[in-house]
Amino acid sequence: MTYLFENYKRAPIEFVKAEGSYLIDSEGKAYLDFSSGIGVTNLGFQPQVQQALIQQAGRIWHSPNLYLSSLQEQVAQELAGSYDYLAFFCNSGAEANEAAIKLARKATGKQGIITFQQSFHGRTFGAMAATGQDKIKEGFGDGVPHFSYAVYND
């Protein structure tokens, strides 16, 4: 019996520890981490990242975009480099995709967006609409309209 909603079919493995790019299961077996926490820990499990997180947690965990953040500004500047770019920070890939959908539609005035068959963009309504897999969308009714799906290498 589980009290967890099964939004994914879970593999019968429990990871209890991580070292570098490896995950260690409850039996002590090491696995090369190809999932990266599905985006949330894509820097691996490095001691320097752990120390930076501990140091930041001692200061402040979160400050919304309603307020200034010198660290956020510094990272945005590093990302932009010498280009005239702006950064938009998100909590997840689905949120980034939702923002990209909105930005593309607002900037162009067009509604249509093309993604690829067999793609995966997230589980929010806009991200599911962008996803080129019917099985991801089944049971949720009409999604966000105006998506087309191209075939890879066609």
State where each predicted segment sits.
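Short beta-strand-to-turn element immediately C-terminal to the catalytic PLP-Schiff-base lysine
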Residues: 24-25, 43-44, 130
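Active-site-adjacent loop/helix segments that line or gate small-molecule/cofactor pockets in enzymes
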Residues: 1-19, 59
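PLP-dependent aminotransferase-class I/II
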Residues: 119-154
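A generic local structural motif
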Residues: 8-10, 76, 99-101, 133-136
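Active-site and channel-lining beta-strand-loop segments
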Residues: 13-33
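Residues at the C-termini of beta-strands that transition into short coil/loop
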Residues: 19, 91, 117, 151-153
